[in-house]
Amino acid sequence: MESEMETQSARAEEGFTQVTRKGGRRAKKRQAEQLSAAGEGGDAGRMDTEEARPAKRPVFPPLCGDGLLSGKEETRKIPVPANRYTPLKENWMKIFTPIVEHLGLQIRFNLKSRNVEIRTCKETKDVSALTKAADFVKAFILGFQVEDALALIRLDDLFLESFEITDVKPLKGDHLSRAIGRIAGKGGKTKFTIENVTRTRIVLADVKVHILGSFQNIKMARTAICNLILGNPPSKVYGNIRAVASRSADRF
């Protein structure tokens, strides 16, 4: 036995480590509690130092409109289909005047590319002028009257929305024609009623429907048109949109 103990001690001296029995569950639990307590103390100290030393946020000065417009000239191009050449030519001065005089932009009709081109210049003061002018011309190209499309320049909360009848219901042939007829009504009565109740403007161009108005009003008009496409009778649609319009009027 003594010789065995001597060999073990010699091995330990040579570099071998002795294996000792690990502690039980209680010892492990006690050790974990000590580590967690030390960690919480460290976190608390770290939080105290962070609160004492607040992070500095960078402060940038606000950009002015002149600074945004001082860069390169911006251009918008609106393609014109063949069926809108004549109306564009007849109403060119009504389109040209507000864009040039009120918004301070430059506009021309490119005969080669068949596009209406609008660009900024030194006289442009408003950052959003180019977008307003492009929406105005686009609304006229889609079929709206100049007086109705002009509201896109005067008011900020007006939008354009377009969708196809076949997006609501995949109709073909006579079924599609009947759906278009239900939206328009006899002599345009149904379309005019929806426009007056929802305070919007609607253009029916073949299978496409274009709506001009505020967000809430566009939503009401779109719901009414979708119900007509799905086959609801006009009298029921009238009642629904009048009820919704009266509720929204009371709310505001």
From Swiss-Prot:
InterPro entries: KH-I_PNO1_first, KH_dom, KH_dom_type_1_sf, KH_PNO1_2nd. GO terms for biological process: ribosomal small subunit biogenesis. It is found in: Nucleus, Nucleolus. Its main location: nucleus. The modification N-acetylmethionine is found at residue 1. Residues 173-225 form the KH domain. Residues 1-10 have a biased composition (Polar residues). Part of the small subunit (SSU) processome, first precursor of the small eukaryotic ribosomal subunit. During the assembly of the SSU processome in the nucleolus, many ribosome biogenesis factors, an RNA chaperone and ribosomal proteins associate with the nascent pre-rRNA and work in concert to generate RNA folding, modifications, rearrangements and cleavage as well as targeted degradation of pre-ribosomal RNA by the RNA exosome. Positively regulates dimethylation of two adjacent adenosines in the loop of a conserved hairpin near the 3'-end of 18S rRNA. This is RNA-binding protein PNO1.
